[in-house]
Amino acid sequence: MLDPVGCGATAYRTQVAAELAALAPTVIRGNASEILSLSGQVGAASKGVDSSARAEDATSAAATLAQRAGCVVAVTGATDYVCDGANCVSVHSGHALMPLSTALGCSLSAVTAAFAAVRPPKLAAAAALAVFGAAGAVAAQRCQGPGHLPAEICDTLYRMDHATLARHARLS
């Protein structure tokens, strides 16, 4: 599992992320700017760890990166995408508060790694994005702002069931 945090923000981060991607991780998960940068898109840059691009604009880069690295690439945003080089699956879940909370991307990468330990990579990544996004949607209804959202997501993950997932996530 590779989460190229801040790839594109500095030359050093981009270089290290590229070196790690060359080690054939099972899944690479990042925001659109990180995936665009890691795939070698000229002019791709991030604002620190925040994305300056939309996930749907990075699906071609994700597919190319998946082919080159021989892995599954997950791009997160308002809609998430999981690409294996042949095709991409879109995951519709989450909440607008999620990008405003620190460390949720890292938490999602940890959940994705756990799923990938027991299921095939593409299925694992799509399922992790759906479950985490559904947890975010439910948690956001219980919070008044982004500050308590990460803790509420943890609690919601603990309580996650099939009915909640079906109400708050859709794959296409």
How should each PLM-predicted stretch be described?
Residues 1-4, 45-47:
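Short beta-strands and strand-loop turn motifs
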Residues 6-10, 81, 98:
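Short, small-residue-enriched loops and turns at beta-alpha junctions
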Residues 11-88:
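Conserved phosphate/ATP/ADP-binding segment of small-molecule kinases
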Residues 37, 100-130:
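Short, small-residue alpha-helix embedded
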Residues 61-66, 121-136, 153-154:
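Short, well-structured alpha-helical segments that form the helix of a local strand-helix-strand
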Residues 91-102:
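Short pre-catalytic strand/loop immediately N-terminal to key active-site residues, enriched for Gly-Thr
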Residues 134-172:
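Charged C-terminal helix
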